[in-house]
């Protein structure tokens, strides 16, 4: 389902026309993102690595070799994304990207660490062969390996669940440029749509101080 279809469902339940100046579609869009994130956090609080494919987005991000990150200096051994990644949904047990791949779809086995641990990664001889991944406070992703085996990469594919799918979409690996962002498939399970519509509708009804009988009930056959 597209976000535009979800927006129209909300407007229909509120008996508001899309050109009504009291309510912008952008506000409805933002609330849809917020409620989607809330439901995903609740539903997958204990199984952050078992997200359904429908809610994921794979982004293609350029990377570059840098000499320093968070006080860690080791020329040519730190690969960083050229931009800060879009904000991901924070779920317990999922402390970083769900998957990082090369452009040929080969998965890069990564050990996720806190950015504060970067200066000490290769001190242990038993773990220094691992490839590490860290995300800094600005959202940049860093890949580090002692043998510098990733130095020739120019871009990577990062799969995650993003708070604002519309923002993340501009970096997606496969995107239909002929579609407006709201006319593309929205990354949400079909089973979650009705709940999101209901939550957004209730929030907006309170905000707009609509009388109870002005809001279509889901049981009226149109929800």
Residue locations for each model-derived region?
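Glycine-enriched, solvent-exposed interface loops adjoining structured elements
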Residues: 1-223
């Amino acid at each position: 389902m597209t976000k535009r279809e979800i927006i129209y469902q909300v407007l229909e339940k509120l008996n508001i026309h899309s050109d009504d100046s009291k309510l912008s579609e952008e506000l409805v869009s933002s609330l849809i993102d917020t409620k989607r994130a809330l439901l995903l956090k609740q539903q997958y609080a204990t199984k952050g690595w078992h997200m359904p494919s429908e809610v994921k987005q794979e982004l293609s991000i350029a990377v570059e070799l840098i000499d320093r990150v968070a006080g860690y200096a080791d020329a040519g051994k730190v690969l960083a994304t050229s931009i800060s990644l879009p904000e991901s949904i924070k779920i317990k047990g999922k402390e970083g990207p769900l998957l990082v791949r090369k452009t040929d779809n080969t998965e890069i086995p990564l050990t996720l660490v806190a950015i504060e641990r970067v200066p000490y990664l290769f001190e242990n001889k038993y773990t220094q062969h691992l490839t590490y991944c860290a995300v800094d406070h600005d959202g940049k992703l860093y890949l580090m390996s002692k043998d510098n085996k990733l130095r020739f990469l120019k871009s990577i594919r990062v799969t995650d669940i993003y708070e604002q799918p519309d923002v993340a979409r501009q970096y997606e690996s496969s995107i239909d440029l002929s579609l407006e962002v709201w006319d593309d498939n929205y990354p949400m399970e079909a089973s979650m749509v009705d709940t999101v519509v209901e939550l957004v509708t209730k929030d907006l009804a309170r905000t707009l101080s609509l009388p109870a009988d002005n809001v279509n009930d889901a049981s009226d056959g149109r929800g």
